[in-house]
């Protein structure tokens, strides 16, 4: 029994020396205690039933292998390859059989080194293991597709409202915040899974490359199977990741445009306020000048009266009438009052 711990999962590999009479009957999995299997709280991602056969010169012929493969696998999805310079033949249809396992078979030449056989087995298990883990990302993006579509539509509506200018900036900002929050939540939830999927995909293709596949009897190779069945799913994951990033960029641009719109509106409001303040200041200045003029008249009136009262007794000695005296002192008094008020105002400023 071999146990391996990975970042997200663990693997259990059991090796049995004797081949069962009925290929892929799943009896080897009975070696795992049922109560132990039932006690596992984790989800089983994949299960591989790999059969290893060492062929004699006669049995290792292409016809015998082809006959066995036809009996063990579904022909429509069967992938077969000679690997590592023809030292072995690997095959699988990548389908789950009736007992819940994926079937792999490895035919090896009797002269093939045990270490090389072990490496081939390790690569085959890793191909299926990392393929299954990467498909978790495909399941995630399928569940995200509708939500991303809704966010895309909402962003389009927000941009349309901003273009029309009929919706208040506060309403647009509230809608944009809701969409941005939903988008950020979605991105945070999917970021790790999409990144892990990309890493797992790279491992799958790397493991297939190191097998150095050669075509067997015109059948599709593992790399060709992956290109037809696996790569489209991974391209969907990549395109969804790019789409998610584009949605985030659109939300950022929408926020920038809204900020620009608010700044322009605020600038226009400030300009209007400054214009209003200028008009008000001009009005206050004119009113101040009017009040100043009235103040000069009022003060001058009382000043002339006081000066007349003071000078009239003296003016009688010279036979000067009160009216003539008033007319003489009015202009000088008014001038003095005006100069006095101007001086007071200049000191206040």
Where are these regions (language model features)?
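N-terminal juxtamembrane/topogenic regions of multi-pass membrane proteins
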Residues: 3, 80-88, 340, 345
